[in-house]
Regions:
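Amphipathic alpha-helical transducer elements in NTP-driven molecular machines
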Residues: 9-16, 33-36, 40, 76-87, ...
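Basic, low-complexity terminal or inter-domain segments flanking catalytic cores
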Residues: 2-3, 25, 79, 90, ...
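Intrinsically disordered, low-complexity regulatory segments
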Residues: 1-162, 166, 427, 470
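Metal- or metallocofactor-binding catalytic centers and their adjacent structured scaffolds
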Residues: 233-265, 271, 547
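C-terminal or mid-to-C-terminal helical accessory/interaction module adjacent to the motor/catalytic core
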Residues: 135-217, 254-258
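Conserved short loop/turn motifs at secondary-structure junctions
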Residues: 1, 101-104, 181-183, 254-263, ...
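Feature marking long nucleic-acid-engaging regions of large polymerase/nuclease enzymes
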Residues: 97-98, 114-127, 188, 199-203, ...
């Protein structure tokens, strides 16, 4: 028997169907000489720091840095059953070979190898490496399985990445958490991502709005605008001069321009567009795409490619024909796809772009939940746009001179709507029309037929006032773009991963920052919290710059190619962890207080007016020179069996008295209702007295 191990149950089922393994068992499928099982993502991972000794169970500066000499692995607590199943299958006497069918990429290699090694498997290993889950691609992949040893360098690269993230993440998180007495999660990807939000927030906060003006001339019904003018008086003077002058057309340029169709979706671009059109978070979009994938209506979503493989032309053509019949917005549209634009096997690494599948033919779109239907339709519309004709237009720029200044008018004439017609139709069909973030260049009007040398006497002129605008806060769409581009100028063109994170992990990074209290959502906006801003301020540039990721990716790419030494890379990471701990042995008192939660004052001190706060045993004045203190265990309250709560303290500070029910009388042994009055005489101790309600 040949044991095939996929990354997820849904993928295993697809492979099993192709191989003829139809008999369902607990945790695997079998038949036709194959056993097909799955990993459920990361079954095995690097053990936590506490696994390396008692001294690491408690977070302390003295135990840092933590540098394991022999790495330990652990099975995820909620996945022990599936690991046991895989281990038993690997050790079955009738299994003579194991096929790694996990995702074709660095992380897929790591997921399989961790399980293979922890299970103690020594059987021959081969690798399935495919870019499509179409039946034909799976069959072809199994006909050309490669020896597992050919991917040893890729595994070494993946292992280095995992260990390096562990070393820097664990040591930096513990170091700064201990120093600041507050849990501060530090990570190679999430920390530079947080810095992007903090930098944008600072740019908005320091932005100073400035007014500027344009003088606009009306010429044969068209409008020509001056350059930006910062002084209102200067703009008014130019307007007056122009109205008494002559405008001359000094330049007329006509250019035929082309707007190429958008590329197919990879995960990040799908998340950006879904956020822009529907307001979905990156995680929501990933979850929806995954659900559609498991329903076999959408191809694998965790991809960084925007192309299809060369052998998918016929498949794509069939899907496009299906979409034209399924989508109401394509009704009456004669469409001939240009498939060559989207086929390029060289630009597909792990998985091809996200597109609908032929399963759509059997599916009723209206039966899907609306949010899933939105994602599926979006992916389908993008496939249609990507294979449509380019949008072509004639751009006209006319320059005029008047009163010694230049004025420009711009217009366009559409020659072929191309893909923008499909985009327009798709948007018109949306239930909720999205807000437009940018001014569409299609709104430029057609200019009248100007000629060079044409003159206009005493043109009508107006002055328009404008404000410079601050940068916009990041939303998920803009942050995903920034993460994708981050550090790319420092990254090797051949690096498998560029930017911060991967398409599959960026959503989780954003969610982790929100959950950790470093970022908050306000509508579509992502804003850093006070803790988030402080964290970026206290961390060294090494940890907040995307350059570290770029450097790592360059090295990891070389390791994957067998051109760099994994041991040397890890030695450098360990040195970095040592240096980090060595550089930050202690903090000043002021800095150590940065992450203390803001205290809420109970009221004002009756003696000096300073805020009064709750302590462990008392309520005290924050002015160190003032001795006003109300003790929680004051004998006055204990004798009357009253718990001196913050609510009572606040009332005493506000009005000097508080009504309390069921006061105990030591003399009578009974309870009564009364008013406790703050009878402060300014001495070392605060006094109180009880006033009884007046009898009517």
């Amino acid at each position: 028997m040949i044991l095939v191990i996929a990354e997820k149950p849904s993928v295993a089922q697809t492979i099993a169907a192709v191989l003829g393994a139809k008999e369902k068992k607990d945790g695997f499928l079998t038949g036709s000489g194959y056993i097909v099982s799955w990993c459920v993502g990361h079954l095995v991972g690097l053990a936590e720091a506490a696994a390396y000794g008692e001294q690491y169970k408690k977070w302390s500066y003295d135990s840092l840095p933590i540098l394991p000499q022999e790495w330990k692995y652990t099975v995820a607590a909620d996945k022990e059953k599936q690991f046991k199943t895989l281990k038993e299958l690997m050790h079955r006497t009738d299994v003579f070979e194991v096929v790694n069918a996990c995702d074709a990429g660095r992380e897929g290699e790591l997921i399989f190898r961790f399980v293979y090694e922890m299970a103690g498997c020594k059987k021959p290993m081969r690798r399935l490496w495919i870019s499509s889950m179409e039946d034909s691609a799976i069959k072809e992949g199994f006909s050309r399985l490669k020896n597992g040893e050919e991917y040893d360098a890729l595994f070494a690269s993946a292992l280095c990445r995992a260990k390096a993230d562990w070393l820097i993440g664990i040591n930096a998180t513990r170091l700064f958490s201990v120093l600041y007495n507050h849990t501060l999660n530090v990570g190679r990807v999430q920390t530079p991502t947080l810095k992007m939000l903090v930098d944008r927030d600072a740019a908005i906060a320091t932005f100073k709005k400035e007014k500027y003006y344009h003088v606009r001339l009306t010429l044969s019904g068209a409008e020509a605008a001056s350059e930006r003018i910062s002084d209102k008086a200067e703009a008014d003077a130019l307007k007056t001069t122009c109205e008494a002058s002559k405008a001359v057309c000094t330049s007329l340029v006509k250019e035929k321009k082309t707007a190429a169709p958008p590329k197919l979706f990879d995960l990040t671009s799908l998340q950006r567009e879904a956020n822009r059109l529907f307001g979905y978070t990156a995680k929501q979009t990933l979850d929806l795409a995954q659900a559609l994938y498991e329903k076999r209506l959408l191809t694998y979503p965790r991809t960084d490619s925007s192309y299809l493989t060369d052998d998918m032309g016929d498949t794509a053509a069939g899907i496009i024909k299906l979409l034209c019949g399924k989508f109401s917005f394509m009704a009456g549209k004669d469409f001939t796809p240009e498939l060559g634009k989207v086929l390029n096997s060289k630009k597909v690494s792990d998985h091809h772009a996200i597109i609908p599948t032929m399963e759509l033919a059997k599916s009723d779109l209206s039966a899907l939940p609306e949010i899933e239907r939105n994602i599926l339709t979006l992916a389908g519309a993008r496939l249609l746009m990507a294979t449509a004709a380019p949008h072509t237009f004639e751009a006209v720029t006319a320059v005029f001179e008047c009163a010694g200044q230049s004025f420009t008018a711009r217009g366009k004439t559409i020659l072929c709507e191309g893909w923008k017609e499909i985009d327009r139709r798709y948007r018109a069909a949306l239930k909720n029309k999205p807000e437009t973030d940018e001014v569409d260049s299609d709104t430029e009007k057609t200019l009248p037929p100007f000629t060079e040398g044409q003159t206009f006497e005493n043109p009508a002129a107006t002055v328009t006032e404008h404000d410079t605008t601050p940068p916009k806060p990041h939303n998920e769409a803009s942050l995903l773009s920034a993460m994708e581009r981050a550090g790319s100028e420092d990254t090797d063109p051949d690096a498998e991963r560029k930017g911060l994170g991967t398409p599959a992990t960026r959503a989780a990074v954003i969610e982790k920052l929100v959950k950790g209290g470093f970022v908050e959502r306000k509508g579509k906006q992502l804003l850093p919290t006070k803790d988030g801003i402080n964290l970026v301020c206290v961390l060294p540039d090494t940890l907040t710059s995307p350059q570290l990721t770029a450097e790592w990716e360059n090295n990891l790419t070389q390791i994957a190619k067998g051109k760099a030494d994994p041991a040397a890379f890890m030695e450098g990471i360990e040195d970095m962890a040592r240096e980090l701990v060595k550089t930050y042995p202690f903090l000043s008192d002021d800095k150590a207080q940065m992450f203390k939660p803001e205290r809420e004052a109970l009221g004002s001190c009756p003696r000096c007016g300073s805020p009064v706060y709750e302590g462990k045993k008392n309520y005290y004045c924050s002015n160190k020179e003032c001795i006003f203190t109300m003790w929680k265990n004051d004998r006055f309250f204990e004798e009357r069996k009253v718990t001196f709560t913050p609510k009572i303290a606040a009332a005493l500070l506000k009005s000097g008295k508080v009504n309390v029910k069921k006061l105990y009388s030591p003399k009578t042994g009974k309870t009564y209702d009364g008013t406790i009055v703050l009878a402060d005489t300014g001495g070392k101790y605060v006094n109180y007295r009880v006033e009884l309600p007046k009898k009517k």
